Amino acid sequence: MEIEKNYRINSLFEFYQPLLTKKQNDYLELYYGDDYSLGEIAENFHVSRQAVYDNIKRTESILEDYEAKLHLYAEFQVRNQQADRIQRYVRENYPDDATLNHLVNHLESLEEE
């Protein structure tokens, strides 16, 4: 469960990072991206562990709120699943069509950007 939560928060962070404050960005990057403890972050920013914890929890809630309103991550997941299905279908049914395979690969690379 914890791994899934971390993955989700990291994914939401990728989508909504520009909407967060610098402090929110810094705390989440250190906590989820660099695996810092609350104590290490608190020490770096000269604040209490509780202040860091509260900020991270509040920021997680903000990210979930953005996703509930904008659905960027959910739509990205759907597009990725569809792109995977198309890619599988083309590889299975048109393995010799170099142009089609190239176009599908290009589509997949665009989605990853």
Curated annotation (Swiss-Prot):
Q: Which domain of life is it from?
A: Bacteria
Q: Which Pfam families match?
A: UPF0122
Q: Which InterPro entries match?
A: RNA_pol_sigma_r3/r4-like, UPF0122, UPF0122_fam_protein, WH-like_DNA-bd_sf
Task: Name the SUPFAM superfamilies on file.
Answer: Sigma3 and sigma4 domains of RNA polymerase sigma factors
Q: Which residues form a coiled coil?
A: none
Similarity-based family: Belongs to the UPF0122 family.
Q: According to its UniProt entry, what is the function of this protein?
A: Might take part in the signal recognition particle (SRP) pathway. This is inferred from the conservation of its genetic proximity to ftsY/ffh. May be a regulatory protein.
NCBIfam families assigned to the protein according to its UniProt record, in alphabetical order: PRK00118.1-4, PRK00118.1-6, YlxM
Q: What is this protein called?
A: UPF0122 protein Lreu_1156
